[in-house]
Amino acid sequence: MERKITKEIHIGDRVIGGGNPILIQSMTNTKTEDVDATVAQIRQLTQAGCDIIRCAVPTMEAACALEEIKKQVEIPVVADIHFDYRLAIAAMEHGADKIRINPGNIGSLDRIKAVVDVAKERNIPIRVGVNSGSLEKELVEKYHGVTAEGIVESALDKVHIIEDLGYDNLVISIKSSDVLMCVKAYELISSQTDYPLHVGITESGTLTSGNIKSSIGLGLILHQGIGDTIRVSLTGDPIEEIKSAKLILRTLGLRKGGIEVVSCPTCGRTQIDLIGLANRVENLVAGYPLDIKVAVMGCVVNGPGEAKEADLGVAGGIGEGLLIKHGQVVKKMPEEELLPALKYELDHWGE
């Protein structure tokens, strides 16, 4: 697919826009002022594949904590600010690589200018974030409800405020929990601006519902070439957000690397604990950077044929199974040896 080329923006040592790879974001759910807990979670997320992390900054203590957090992590840190412009300034003074604000709830123009002046002085990007839930009353009335058009107008109004203050180091995010409204909003704003866009479906839900809604919404948006950073917002462990985001990007051909696991849905011919085996295989391959496909099949009758499009695979039988490589059965072995055999092949892949 052809991606839209947006304005290039530097966030710490990462670059978004300008045709650069789409980066994965998440958000910590620790108390930011708890430096040890926050650093530990950021490190876990980094290892899982997170490129940029956002931290809530609801207090001055949290803003000041960013300085120590920054010393101990390897990825850019974004400060999430609401209402108090002084927290935005403090976050930047204590090392935030980017701030996320909604100028509409920061206060007067003087307060917005105070934030922009510090960002300009330090060349720190500002993410202008607008959610459907915070849409201004006059725009709700103008468009007869909460609409994609209203969300886009709100976001661009905020952008123009900052541009009029002489600053354009900006990223835009517009979010709604209504998937189709969100898709339409991103289509509209992408046609009206060249700023990089952070995309996501807000308040998408728990692991199952959130993944489904995010996959549909992000898939529709990204497939049009729209988006420079993404977040899969889930109610749960943020590690799951990274797993889902990586899979969405790989499925759309927007990211290489990382093993894709495919498995059959089970049927009456299944002769092995396929669900358990597939989960163990997923856990096994998570740490490999290989750009290959691994198949996990439930029977030795159809398994080899169905796994022929995979680079590597296993198929289970009654107490035994097959190791399959490039569509060919290479070895028959006891069931308990399947996982070790698969690991050996991964460890020696390409030799």
Predicted feature residues:
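N-terminal amphipathic alpha-helix/helix-capping segment at the start of soluble metabolic enzymes
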Residues: 1-27, 120, 283
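Active-site mouth loops of central-metabolism enzymes
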Residues: 19-37, 56, 75-83, 139-152, ...
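Conserved, mostly hydrophobic/aromatic
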Residues: 24, 80, 128, 172, ...
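Glycine-rich, proline-tolerant flexible connector loops at the mouths of alpha/beta enzymes
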Residues: 29, 34-35, 46-69, 100-108, ...
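Alpha-helix-loop-beta-strand connector modules within alpha/beta enzyme cores
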Residues: 60-81, 114-126, 186-197, 281-283
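Glycine-enriched alpha-helix->loop->beta-strand junction motifs that scaffold or abut catalytic
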Residues: 72-75, 93-99, 120-122, 190-196, ...
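Hydrophobic or amphipathic alpha-helical targeting/insertion segments
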Residues: 86-127
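Catalytic alpha/beta core domains of metabolic enzymes, predominantly
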Residues: 131, 139-286
